[in-house]
Amino acid sequence: MAGLCSSPWVKLLLAVVLSAGLPGNMANRCKKAQVKSCTECIRVDKSCAYCTDELFKERRCNTQADVLAAGCRGESVLVMESSLEITENIQIDTSLHRSQVSPQGLQVRLRPGEERNFVFKVFEPLESPVDLYILMDFSNSMSDDLDNLKQMGQNLAKILRQLTSDYTIGFGKFVDKVSVPQTDMRPEKLKEPWPNSDPPFSFKNVISLTENVEEFWDKLQGERISGNLDAPEGGFDAILQTAVCTRDIGWRADSTHLLVFSTESAFHYEADGANVLAGIMNRNDEKCHLDATGAYTQYKTQDYPSVPTLVRLLAKHNIIPIFAVTNYSYSYYEKLHKYFPVSSLGVLQEDSSNIVELLEEAFYRIRSNLDIRALDSPRGLRTEVTSDTLQKTETGSFHIKRGEVGTYNVHLRAVEDIDGTHVCQLAKEDQRGNIHLKPSFSDGLRMDASVICDMCACELQKEVQSARCHYRGDFMCGHCVCNEGWSGKTCNCSTGSLSDTQPCLREGEDKPCSGHGECQCGRCVCYGEGRYEGHFCEYDNFQCPRTSGFLCNDRGRCSMGECVCEPGWTGRSCDCPLSNATCIDSNGGICNGLGFCECGRCHCNQRSSLYTDTTCEINYSAIRLGLCEDLRSCVQCQAWGTGEKKGRTCEECNFKVKMVDELKKAEEVVEYCSFRDEDDDCTYSYTVEGDGSPGPNSTVLVHKKKDCLPAPSWWLIPLLIFLLLLLVLLLLLCWKYCACCKACLGLLPCCNQGHMVGFKEDHYMLRENLMASDHLDTPMLRSGNLKGRDTVRWKITNNVQRPGFATHAASISPTELVPYGLSLRLGRLCTENLMKPGTRECDQLRQEVEENLNEVYRQVNGVHKLQQTKFRQQPNAGKKQDHTIVDTVLLAPRSAKQSLLKLTEKQVEQGSFHELKVAPGYYTLTAEQDARGMVEFQEGVELVDVRVPLFIRPEDDDEKQLLVEAIDVPVGTATLGRRLVNITIIKEQASGIVSFEQPEYSVSRGDQVARIPVIRHILDNGKSQVSYSTQDNTAHGHRDYVPVEGELLFYPGETWKELQVKLLELQEVDSLLRGRQVRRFQVQLSNPKFGARLGQPNTATVIIGEQDETDRSLINEISASPPLPRGDLGAPQNPNAKAAGSRKIHFNWLPPPGKPMGYRVKYWVQGDSESEAHLLDSKVPSVELTNLYPYCDYEMKVCAYGAHGEGPYSSLVSCRTHQEVPSEPGRLAFNVVSSTVTQLSWAEPAETNGEITAYEVCYGLVNEDNRPIGPMKKVLVDNPKNRMLLIENLRESQPYRYTVKARNGAGWGPEREAIINLATQPKRPMSIPIIPDIPIVDAQGGEDYENFLMYSDDVLRSPASSQRPSVSDDTEHLVNGRMDFAYPGSANSLHRMTAANVAYGTHLSPHQTHRMLSTSSTLTRDYHSLTRTDHSQSGTLPRDYSTLTSLSSQGLPPIWEDGRSRLPLSWTLGSWSRAQMKGVPASRGSPDSIILAGQSAAPSWGTDSRGAMGVPDTPTRLVFSALGPTSLKVSWQEPQCDRALLGYSVEYQLLNGGEMHRLNIPNPGQTSVVVEDLLPNHSYVFRVRAQSQEGWGREREGVITIESQVHPQSPLCPLPGSAFTLSTPSAPGPLVFTALSPDSLQLSWERPRRPNGDILGYLVTCEMAQGGGPARTFRVDGDNPESRLTVPGLSENVPYKFKVQARTTEGFGPEREGIITIESQDGGPFPQLGSHSGLFQNPLQSEYSTVTSTHSTTTTEPFLIDGLTLGTQRLEAGGSLTRHVTQEFVSRTLTTSGSLSTHMDQQFFQT
């Protein structure tokens, strides 16, 4: 075996197996790469090698193992080797009191993609020198802080001496820039801003670091405060100068540098806008600018530094910041200090009196943290530091122990490419550099690191025009590189002589090279990169024999149609090993000498259950199962004459026994047996040897002596009983003595007086409509001596205003089951996850609680199992308020109350319920009309809350009373004080009555979900809330249905809600055990809140039927089978349908003559084919059609059937369901006109559920926590076509909350919400738009719906000085919402306009107007010239325009009539909504059916997007339905076509490549097909297209996967009977474009929500949308949540199409597309982004459609902004993304091509 493992072939095989198992199959990257040279090959992957052997015939670029296995000589394999060499390594000396690292120098060279690791050691001494520099805010508000600092000199010096014996201390002060607006620039204020103060300044180094503490305090005494004007201070200037001016400050080289930053204000930062007025726009140069007096001199010329700059410079100079700030500014610095790897933050008191304690605490905290960073790292190298022993903090630093050497692991990796560019194609400075690996407190390791990008040596030694290449090419790296026009291995084949294919024809075939290759100069060059071989390419290397699905058992390779096995393997499919290693037994022999080894397996000579199948050894486990027991009786009778076989039966034993003095040890024999003899109670032993099956001549060895126990000591028993009785007597005396002492202490005045417990209040008045819960926390106080523990028992009685009420209720029915509420305090702390239902921790504890409590309470007769178990915390519970409180409910008879109470008190007193630990002293047991409980006062606790139930019932009196009473103190010496509490609950007028529609509902198990409507009758239009829960009856939770519980909240105006309960499939065992019993369960409403009341019925019974499911499963069979023979029954008479709700229709009829056995109802959506109808079976002449679409027309008919078959159907009846409130409107879009004016638009609700009649827009101010400030203003838009609003006079720099909701005939739907601050959004370079037919509202106006102007047909002229636009008196109007474009011809003509989505208006013009419809979404344009002469000529648009639009390539061509152009009204735009996909109910989300619907196609301008006349359009949707784990049904809708269809073509293949399968369907009426033999868990792409006489139409594409469980050994074989579901992969997230310059942009996206495999990276394609250039591709590696790519080299005003798709382990996923244009405006400082719209004459492809919501799974509309972005702030408004930018990133982007290495928080870049 050792020799086998040492074989070089085995090592090679292991290398191949390991490389094949790597992620992404890295071995194939070298093989699949299309390279032309050795250097290109080496750069493909770190494992790639190149064979330079001239005689080598295989692929030269492959892994080293593969080229060696293919026959390349070892000396001809060229591999670039990486290296790592330590150049300086001085060992750490722990006796030195300074920081040290090891090693100090290192040189490393890595191949692209390669990673090397090494160990890095850091030592920090116990005590090190400290430099402490105090930087203090000297604004006037810090005057008291300065006074205190002057007085605490000795304390600070004392603390420093405790920290270290070697320290220095310095002091600096700062205020702000002496400029507007930071400082008051009046002369008198510049001289003395405050009384007795110094002139304002920016920063001054007052005291450099010094060891002389006395000198420090003397200089500090002379300092005076200064002042400035605005609140934020200029501390960032001071911090930067303190860091870079090392000589002026006095920082020492080997000391710990601490910078104390003390302030009570926020800070200015780079580009925050404060310096604009003073003209300070230059960036900080990061240099020292202190004069001789220590003052900062460049405050008037340089901006503040940024946060990343400070982080970098402080780390570079080993400076650790300590932020000592007051509560006022704590929130600013709480986030700021997290950007520093090692820092501290402390709360400074208002007068800085605690600064010494704060410094001491911060120093000890900082000393325990160490940060290691890689500085000056080139772009091509990545460094990561980890540790196996040290823990990382939130900021990335390590927790260390000073005085010990810390060991760290450094991972250095060379990246392969950056933003799609290979690292070897980058600049030299990006490939190599000197990396400084630096710890926080000391100097670090210097690494000379580089990426290996050298050329292959063989390419430098090439033979130019070599004779080996017939002087027609260069010989290089073992092969010829031919000149142009020549090919072949020796360049002997001219590319012009490839026509003769006769030598490449195989006998009997008509295709050259068997159709698998290309004939070149009489030789076949096979396709497939080695797949096909042979002289005629006749051998397919994928067709060799397989074993377990693996080609050649993965132990060989396929060559010439046969398996060529690796060494050590043989057989037709390499499935037989030559080694006998698997046949070696435990003794080292072959098959134990009882068989022979063949093909790696032992074949035993004889079959026996005692031998194993592997090595023919004795199966000892089989022997031991009964061997000792079988021999026992015979050994007992022969050796001792006892046992069950003593006497004559002993002669039947077929072996003899032999008595011996000693037996062999157990490990030396087959079995060692011991048994006890029943006659004398002694133990005898014997052994079994041989093969374990004694024969007639066998002998069993028996030990002569038995082992007997000594005589028992019976006299000990009476003594133990006597001692036990004595102990019980002593305990009884002690208890009596303690009770007597307790009684005596109660009589003493000193012990009894004041030690009392009682309620805090004696009366509470509650109003039911204001109550948010059904309980009340009643405080109970303890006064006097708080030592010791007291427990108090209490009770509460309901309805005390009705005497005898509780007694009468209890005597109604003693055996009736009622719910009892139980609360206990567990002996474990409460966590956040315990209070979240559904978490794993909560579920585990719930199961533990219910199991133990059920075990205890089952001893009470009639008690059911617990339900509704929840966990919470109890505030004001003394020292145990962090413990977990469990609330649960158990059903028990009404008469069991006392038994439950006694049992609960007993178990609480014991502290456990079975194995569940509980805290003694607390419980609550709630019955129907009363409750009892106990609370505990721990030692030192003065107040606890008693949570009492309030018994809220719908039948309560308008004013009911409850009485809480403290009963006694069972534990403790306290006496009861205030014992009674009266609670009065006043019931006012309810806001609404909530109930079910009916008391009983019937559902089918096949529906999978039971939908139970809940209605509210509104009395007062406010909020109402009720709780709901399910209860078992004959149906059982988790077996027939999934139990649910929760709360329903009705908002104002809502009258209808729906409860959904998931139904479970009936298991076979359930159907056998429970038979045909009707399953039913209850849904109960309870606990009304916010003034709600429960109406009748408040309990609904849900009956689960099985017949409907059977009927529905037979729909296809019934519809496909021929009609049954009709009997004598006639058609049902007078069919009548009436809508019973938004999703229900009541259908009834009169029975026909005869005796019908039942009726069959057929119904479908009006307009659909009758073949898609649903069938229902009914025994009575009426039926309830449920689960329908709201506001939808249905057709239905009915027939009767009897014993002889069906009768004729009745006449057709139509009925429309009622309306239902619409869903929330589509995404909100904001067009920011100025800082106080915005244009708000929204999309129609996805589910209109009726006819939209109006929209309501609300907006109002919000604070930083997004909470409303003041009332919201409302605007009613009563024209549903107007989905746009212009809002003026908003407050500048203030965030607003906007909400939009829609209304139809059923009422108002839910709101769509967005919060936006206009000041943070980029402004459009355009004038205020004039928006026809758009409401314009004034934010400063009054309330309600009165303060807005609605302009329908008038043209608006808005002077710059006017707040409101004026109304034109033009009388020309347009109807039906059409829009006129004005074509100006003079400077005075009005040409501004705004086009909205289906929003129209008129414009004045001196020329003839043409009617034209705009189809873009929410865009604003400024047109200066637009001409059109006739229908055939194209219009012109000049360069002078600006757009910010979204792509709508499906433009609408105008139809010209009477000099005007208009759009046919039958065309519609928009995305598919659920209501448009008829035939599939919206509520039936079946997991085995997926619909892929596209946008309705519309032709674009200039060209007909549907192609030639008569060519079919694209099928409008694909529907996939799983039929099994390997088969599915593909359906589609018939496309539109002007000619008759001839048939369809369905193509499908694996998404990651594979054979294309095509199915031709000649029948145009067949719109579905069943596809079999698919692979489970593999993604397939399907394409469907239609054919007419004019040709094939465009195809509809969809990707689908059948997910199922597979066999572990055969991943392509599904497990029989396992579940299967469908899934479809998603595309990457919405594309976000950001302009960087006129010729470059940044593209970012989010990872797909559901990719088809593990993501390896992304592929980005960029090409001109209208052609004209080659496509460019970029690769982005990694799976970051948000990826981005900078694309340079673009052209202005040219539309580009971008595609992004994820590269996964399964191949490439679906694409996300977007078309974008970088458009420039004359005179504008920056470019802006736009998308192509229908107003241009550029012909766009019709498939580039855009959906106006980012929730689409096919395409997305990118929300675009002009200007530059920093990816830190995100605004979400209905799925759209926008990003904010800072000035810092503007300048950096223009200089570094869009690279940004540090993210920033919006707290520091937004004011």
UniProtKB/Swiss-Prot annotation:
Pfam families cross-referenced by the UniProt entry: Calx-beta, EGF_Teneurin, fn3, I-EGF_1, Integrin_B_tail, Integrin_beta, PSI_integrin
Sequence intervals crossing the membrane: 714-734
CDD domains: FN3
Top-level taxonomic group: Eukaryota
Region (Involved in NRG1- and IGF1-binding): 194-199
Residue positions binding Ca(2+) 1: S141, D144, D145, E350
Membrane topology value: Single-pass type I membrane protein; Lipid-anchor
Family per record: Belongs to the integrin beta chain family.
Name of the protein this chain belongs to: Integrin beta-4
Record organism: Rattus norvegicus
Principal subcellular localisation of the protein: membrane
Quaternary context: Heterodimer of an alpha and a beta subunit. Beta-4 associates with alpha-6. Interacts (via cytoplasmic region) with COL17A1 (via cytoplasmic region). Interacts (via cytoplasmic region) with DST isoform 3 (via N-terminus). Interacts (via cytoplasmic domain) with DST (via N-terminus). Interacts with RAC1. ITGA6:ITGB4 is found in a ternary complex with NRG1 and ERBB3. ITGA6:ITGB4 is found in a ternary complex with IGF1 and IGF1R. ITGA6:ITGB4 interacts with IGF2. Interacts with TMEM268; this interaction prevents ITGB4 degradation.
Endpoints of the signal sequence: 1-27
InterPro entries the record matches: CalX-like_sf (IPR038081), Calx_beta (IPR003644), EGF-like_dom (IPR000742), FN3_dom (IPR003961), FN3_sf (IPR036116), I-EGF_1 (IPR040622), Ig-like_fold (IPR013783), Integrin_beta_N (IPR033760)
Keywords from the UniProt entry: Calcium, Cell adhesion, Cell junction, Cell membrane, Disulfide bond, EGF-like domain, Glycoprotein, Integrin, Lipoprotein, Magnesium, Membrane, Metal-binding, Palmitate, Phosphoprotein, Receptor, Repeat, Signal, Transmembrane, Transmembrane helix
